[in-house]
UniProtKB/Swiss-Prot annotation:
Its EC number is 6.2.1.3. Keywords: ATP-binding, Cell membrane, Fatty acid metabolism, Ligase, Lipid metabolism, Magnesium, Membrane, Nucleotide-binding. Optimum pH is 7.5-7.8. Pathway: Lipid metabolism; fatty acid beta-oxidation. Belongs to the ATP-dependent AMP-binding enzyme family. The gene is fadD. Catalyzes the esterification, concomitant with transport, of exogenous long-chain fatty acids into metabolically active CoA thioesters for subsequent degradation or incorporation into phospholipids. Activity is the highest with fatty acid substrates of > 10 carbon atoms. Is involved in the aerobic beta-oxidative degradation of fatty acids, which allows aerobic growth of E.coli on fatty acids as a sole carbon and energy source. GO terms for biological process: acyl-CoA metabolic process; fatty acid beta-oxidation; fatty acid metabolic process; fatty acid transport; lipid metabolic process; phospholipid biosynthetic process; response to UV. Its cofactor is Mg(2+). GO terms for molecular function: ATP binding; decanoate-CoA ligase activity; fatty acid binding; long-chain fatty acid-CoA ligase activity; oleic acid binding; protein homodimerization activity. It comes from the Bacteria. Gene3D superfamilies: 3.30.300.30, N-terminal domain of ligase-like. It comes from Escherichia coli (strain K12). Coiled coil: none annotated. This is Long-chain-fatty-acid--CoA ligase.
Amino acid sequence: MKKVWLNRYPADVPTEINPDRYQSLVDMFEQSVARYADQPAFVNMGEVMTFRKLEERSRAFAAYLQQGLGLKKGDRVALMMPNLLQYPVALFGILRAGMIVVNVNPLYTPRELEHQLNDSGASAIVIVSNFAHTLEKVVDKTAVQHVILTRMGDQLSTAKGTVVNFVVKYIKRLVPKYHLPDAISFRSALHNGYRMQYVKPELVPEDLAFLQYTGGTTGVAKGAMLTHRNMLANLEQVNATYGPLLHPGKELVVTALPLYHIFALTINCLLFIELGGQNLLITNPRDIPGLVKELAKYPFTAITGVNTLFNALLNNKEFQQLDFSSLHLSAGGGMPVQQVVAERWVKLTGQYLLEGYGLTECAPLVSVNPYDIDYHSGSIGLPVPSTEAKLVDDDDNEVPPGQPGELCVKGPQVMLGYWQRPDATDEIIKNGWLHTGDIAVMDEEGFLRIVDRKKDMILVSGFNVYPNEIEDVVMQHPGVQEVAAVGVPSGSSGEAVKIFVVKKDPSLTEESLVTFCRRQLTGYKVPKLVEFRDELPKSNVGKILRRELRDEARGKVDNKA
């Protein structure tokens, strides 16, 4: 496909990037911390960590992993925590030790955590105490040999940290009891690491940096193998796209999205490290009043988020009173930005929400609206520099502009494949092209618009939910005979999970089924709607027709609206 979109690029956005500007993420990091040493890198709960402190602490943590635990280059280390100052210390410590980061959603259930730890073969995990009870239930069934435990306030000043840890544990009671007698404290790891020798590993661009887990049509999470080059390429692509709006050493980005999510990991953490910017880490973005209080303290210049976050902020009266004069970049992704939200955002802040599109397998950015756009296009924008894109029909033939087809992409940001899953890799990457499973339309200028999903994936607040996983869990309930899970529109989260159930036990209730799911699934995957049926529609070979149920369910929602 001819790259028609290049003609629509702003004049100062390059058509190609250099993915080999750095040898590794470690090289990028070390150059940035030297250049911006005394500037703030991260702030959380009022505590500032400079680039110099980040360098010192991450070096100590890397040394501890190497010398204290005896881990080697290529070992996998899981990271399970929300946005805290400990996160970047551990993240860059793992990378600087030549090891592979395995990000874990801290809200995972024991079942989900056990699968990810076993699949990745993680030999160590860094976890915040609030979620240690989950790990306790499964750690003996995994290959994890080392548990490094931290508390919410452990990277704050002594007085403040003591207060935070006391309040979190004893007042708010956010730390369920756990028993991990062999765990090492994060503080001890750093203390010991400062006295150990750090040995910088020899890294090449093709070395793995992350195993970033994503769902699959099989319902089993798979690890996308993202190399240092993949991440650096996407970093340069984001920088090329947004760069004209950003000023090195002078930015403060609001990081309300969790850093364990690929969107915030690349665009907030890594990009602003390279630019010498400051990340304002929001630990609990669901506390909108608390988030707004934090925003009022800082002249933030950039913010990233999903539609639900922007909508919640717009509906907060205190947010409406903030000073937006410093803001010059608002980036939305993870889920479609609704037009009404985009229009309200520009009216309040004076800045357009630049919607983009990406997926874990692409580190993540594939396309974004140009920074000079002065309207809400409703599209996912133009392919980013050094990216090829095409739309194909079911026979893999390219379709002309204006016709729907599956979006396929090729570029330096595309993953190596799925960890230990060559079968799944071959299904998604064919002849060098990654098949996204999303059905899109491209207009004459190259703007892409997603019109449907080839896969049955459900998108809840920017998180992928796969029907097979939900169905597998529901079918474990003894009162269920059959089930089908679909996504239906939801004003609060974009989509919500709805299940259609055929009872085996006539006394089965919606409440008991949802309670059962809550024990097995993290919050955003739990069905919000349950409908009991005498039977489910099936094809002539007996396959449940999810699409028919989804269309019917969406029709009901539309009619109610």
